[in-house]
């Protein structure tokens, strides 16, 4: 890889001086002391004189805490209090910034045992809709600092804490510092600070006010170096970078003049791209017969021409094109040339790695509009934080968005605020949602007139204003739109639908009579339905088997008053229980469940008639007025996802065990497709729905979305259902469900089993696991796909075979995918091959078994 070089010398001195003056007065700085009481804000921090303010106006929720008392004297004031978030999954700070501005963004976390639990939290940190990093206080000690340099895409910057486990996210401070636009530029994405050293024998950290940009400089000196310093002023000719005088007046060089000056470091991820900034100033008296000249060598490759530092003048070297380090081990060396009589020297060194934030934020005008609507009605929904549309799992309640791809800003297309207790008028900010297709403000207490601007929103297809206190006339322009196909609902309001006069008395009388008749009809219908349930209605007496039915009181006893929680999901909470001295898992339907009685009924009826050793067994169910519950055999090792994601307490699955789990899961799905009459499509195959026994026996679970195929094997139209990332794209596009939809989902599970990767990971360049695998396979690199936790302890032949099988399963065209019987056959072969490898690794297994099904040539692995 060619590396661009750049040496910045004296230029634009006047602009630099003006810039320094602006920086020294903290212009553009944002310094939040998280958890600080509003009545203590603002204050000037004693050491830096930085002005900190309370975070209360920038966050919707959270509670405040204090680090334990024995730490108070050791910490700077911003780190003595904190804000923690026991409620909600995503909690976001919303900061007003300047668009297209280069910011140093620094976030500090100091646990300080504020809760007295000695339980170091672990959670995810997001920048807008993209994951930034995982904060793990257990691995990083009591304090964690994360810093990036990032160019803002809009005037709003969201910094979000996302709960990922049982621990509670917390934060101590947030600091933003504007930088010059053309400094610290990554080739793509942003820069994540790895470290920032200045070379001195002092123990003092340097930051503001010595550093006008409030960078934190860490002191470093190695035993093989000699420390040098000067009291002379060093000219700062580096426009925009502005290194502090205290950094430039000190430095280091090798104690042995013939040795190179060497710095080594290990990257957190071997594939990280590296950017380095080297600050050099000649701060020694160099005699006329002396020369200091050296080359800059990174990983044994020269990256800069021979360089001679200028006396008492600072210069910076950096690479515009990122570097990579083999195996994640990096070595920087300053090596003197044959012409040089003096050893190399260096004053300071900054190390960054590239970080990508690929997902575009929601269209800024849409964000401003929906936040204005939120403010107009005083909405305080816990989900209404951060980006409204992305990531999908954090979509704001009541919104639907059009998300095309990661590079295109999502647009809000539906706003549903029905039954939200809204008061006041319909705000004009709604018209700024220019792509809105559906608007539902029904069943609120809205007053005033129906605004004419609704007629000008050209994409609106549905407007539901029923059940409010609106008055006046419906604008003629809106009635004209209704004639053109707009669905307009304005009943249960004091509204005149036609132009002209109000309803006459006769019309009112007729209306009253009509209402009376309607009420009478509804009463008759209600009485008839009480006598005989309609055929289409789901009734609680429709189950064919009552011999496994339990009362809610029975469930209470089984779970010992719902004492031990072993899992949570879309259905509700799963409790550990005991029935007839046998362990059981009891899944209790939550009142707020996104699923509900229809899926409960589907699962019970299916499991009452379908039995197979690779399907989780239903022991019984509860269906009474007090609640709904499903009672299963207990699978002691939890679900497959927990073991692949490295959940604490879960062991790393060996390669043979992974193949065994894949085969047993495939057998379960195959039985649904071929062994049941009528045939069944699961519709929600994923790693969390594959449960493991104490012996790691795999069984398929969660049949709430399953559909029976009454006629043949042809695809059948149905409402799209499933889980994002596992969903068959052809099914999603056409709404035609087939057995091959399960095959696609199972192919995604196979990729998880092979790689241990998340199905969707926004920190990857190719965030979807299918795209990620396809990209790697272009180079035939199996080692980069297989889970690194296996430490290369796997059979390459069977691994390739499974990768090929997985990629054939996720073919975008369903006809090109294998059926589940073919999948089972191939996995059987893979397991046999693996067993031979395991028993005797001396046996030559380099000749792979050929896949007997058609594989898409575009995604077929190209090398072995």
Swiss-Prot record:
Please provide the record's keywords in A-Z order: ATP-binding, Glycoprotein, Kinase, Leucine-rich repeat, Membrane, Nucleotide-binding, Phosphoprotein, Receptor, Repeat, Serine/threonine-protein kinase, Signal, Transferase, Transmembrane, Transmembrane helix
List residues, modification Phosphothreonine: 551, 718, 723
Q: Where are the LRR repeats?
A: 411-434, 435-457, 459-480
* Positions bound to ATP: 566-574, 587
Which InterPro entries does the annotation name?
A: Kinase-like_dom_sf, Leu-rich_rpt, LRR_dom_sf, Malectin-like_Carb-bd_dom, Prot_kinase_dom, Protein_kinase_ATP_BS, Ser/Thr_kinase_AS
Which Pfam families does the protein's record reference?
LRR_8 (PF13855), Malectin_like (PF12819), Pkinase (PF00069)
Q: Which residues form the signal peptide?
A: 1-23
The regions listed as transmembrane in this protein's record are 508-528
**Residues in the Cytoplasmic compartment per record:** 529-864
Gene Ontology molecular function, alphabetical: ATP binding; protein serine kinase activity; protein serine/threonine kinase activity
What reaction does this catalyse?
L-seryl-[protein] + ATP = O-phospho-L-seryl-[protein] + ADP + H(+); L-threonyl-[protein] + ATP = O-phospho-L-threonyl-[protein] + ADP + H(+)
- At which residues is glycosylation annotated? 49, 229, 256, 289, 432, 445, 464
The protein, known as? Probable LRR receptor-like serine/threonine-protein kinase At1g07550
Give the taxonomic lineage as stored in the record.
Eukaryota, Viridiplantae, Streptophyta, Embryophyta, Tracheophyta
């Amino acid at each position: 890889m060619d590396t661009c070089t750049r040496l910045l010398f004296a230029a634009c001195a006047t602009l630099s001086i003006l810039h320094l003056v602006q920086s020294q007065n903290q212009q553009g700085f944002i310094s939040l002391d998280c958890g600080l009481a509003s009545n203590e804000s603002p204050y000037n921090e004693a050491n830096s004189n930085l002005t900190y303010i309370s975070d209360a106006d920038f966050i919707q929720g959270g509670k405040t805490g204090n680090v334990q008392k024995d730490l108070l004297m050791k910490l700077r004031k911003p780190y003595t209090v904190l804000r923690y978030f026991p409620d909600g999954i995503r909690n976001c700070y919303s900061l007003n910034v300047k668009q297209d501005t280069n910011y140093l963004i620094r976030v500090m976390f100091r646990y300080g045992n504020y809760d007295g639990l000695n339980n170091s939290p672990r959670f995810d940190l997001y920048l807008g809709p993209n994951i930034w990093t995982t904060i793990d206080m257990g691995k990083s000690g009591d304090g964690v600092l994360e810093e990036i340099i990032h160019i803002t895409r809009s005037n709003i910057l969201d910094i979000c804490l996302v709960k990922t486990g049982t621990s509670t996210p917390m934060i101590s401070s947030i600091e933003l510092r504007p930088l010059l636009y053309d400094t610290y530029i990554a080739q793509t994405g942003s820069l994540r600070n790895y470290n920032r050293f200045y070379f001195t024998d002092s123990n003092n950290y340097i930051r503001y006010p010595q550093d006008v940009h409030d960078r934190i400089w860490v002191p470093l000196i190695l035993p093989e170096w000699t420390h040098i310093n000067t009291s002379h002023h060093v000219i700062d000719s580096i426009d925009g970078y502005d290194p502090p005088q205290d950094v430039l007046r000190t430095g280091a060089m090798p104690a042995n003049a013939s040795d190179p000056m060497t710095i080594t470091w290990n990257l957190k991820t071997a594939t990280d791209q590296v950017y380095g900034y080297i600050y050099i100033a000649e701060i020694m008296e160099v005699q006329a017969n002396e020369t200091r000249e050296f080359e800059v060598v990174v990983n044994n490759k020269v990256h800069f021409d021979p360089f001679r530092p200028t006396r008492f003048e600072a210069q910076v070297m950096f690479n515009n094109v990122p570097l990579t380090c083999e195996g994640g081990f990096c070595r920087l060396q300053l090596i003197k040339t044959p012409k040089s009589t003096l050893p190399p020297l260096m004053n300071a060194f900054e190390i960054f790695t590239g970080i990508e934030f690929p997902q575009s934020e929601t269209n800024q005008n849409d964000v401003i509009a929906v936040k204005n609507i939120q403010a107009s009605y005083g909405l305080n929904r816990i989900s209404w934080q951060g980006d409204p549309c992305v990531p999908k799992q954090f979509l704001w309640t009541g919104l639907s968005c059009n998300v095309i791809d990661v590079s295109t800003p999502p647009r809000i297309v539906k706003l549903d605020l029905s039954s939200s207790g809204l008061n006041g008028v319909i705000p004009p900010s709604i018209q700024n949602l220019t792509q809105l297709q559906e608007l539902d403000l029904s069943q609120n207490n809205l007053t005033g007139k129906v605004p004419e601007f609704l007629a000008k929103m050209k994409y609106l297809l549905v407007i539901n204003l029923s059940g409010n206190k609106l008055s006046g006339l419906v604008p003629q322009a809106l009635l004209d739109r209704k004639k053109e196909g707009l669905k307009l609902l304005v009943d249960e309001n004091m509204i005149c639908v036609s132009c002209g006069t109000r309803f006459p008395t006769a019309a009112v009388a007729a209306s009253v009579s009509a209402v009376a008749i309607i009420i009478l009809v509804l009463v008759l219908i209600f009485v008839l339905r009480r006598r005989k349930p309609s055929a289409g209605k789901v009734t609680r007496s429709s189950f064919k088997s009552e011999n496994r039915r339990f009362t809610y009181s029975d469930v209470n006893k089984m779970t010992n008053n719902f004492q031990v929680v072993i899992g949570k999901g879309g259905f509700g909470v799963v409790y550990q229980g005991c029935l007839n001295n046998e362990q059981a898992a009891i899944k209790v339907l939550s009142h707020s469940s996104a699923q509900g009685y229809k899926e409960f009924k589907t699962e019970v009826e299916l499991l009452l008639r379908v039995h197979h050793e690779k399907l989780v067994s239903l022991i019984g169910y509860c269906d009474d007025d007090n609640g709904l519950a499903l009672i299963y055999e207990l699978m002691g090792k939890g679900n497959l996802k927990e073991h692949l994601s490295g959940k604490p307490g879960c062991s790393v699955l060996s390669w043979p065990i992974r193949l065994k789990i894949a085969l047993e899961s495939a057998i379960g799905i195959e039985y649904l497709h071929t062994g049941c009459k009528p045939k069944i499509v699961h519709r929600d195959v994923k790693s969390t729905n594959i449960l493991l026994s104490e012996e790691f026996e795999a069984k398929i679970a969660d049949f709430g979305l399953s559909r029976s195929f009454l006629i043949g094997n042809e695809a059948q139209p149905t409402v799209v259902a499933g889980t994002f990332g596992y969903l068959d794209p052809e099914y999603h596009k056409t709404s035609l469900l087939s057995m091959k939809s399960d095959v696609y989902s199972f192919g995604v599970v196979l990729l998880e089993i092979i790689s241990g990767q998340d199905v969707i990971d926004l920190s990857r360049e190719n965030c979807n696991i299918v795209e990620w695998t396809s990209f790697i396979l272009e180079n035939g690199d199996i080692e980069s796909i297989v889970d690194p936790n296996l430490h290369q302890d796997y059979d390459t032949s069977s691994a390739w075979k499974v990768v090929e099988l997985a990629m054939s399963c996720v073919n975008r065209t369903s006809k090109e995918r294998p059926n589940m019987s073919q999948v089972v056959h191939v996995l059987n072969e893979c397991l046999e091959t693996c067993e031979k490898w395991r028993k005797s690794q001396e046996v030559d297994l380099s000749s792979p078994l050929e896949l007997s099904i058609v594989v898409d040539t575009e995604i077929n692995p190209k090398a072995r």
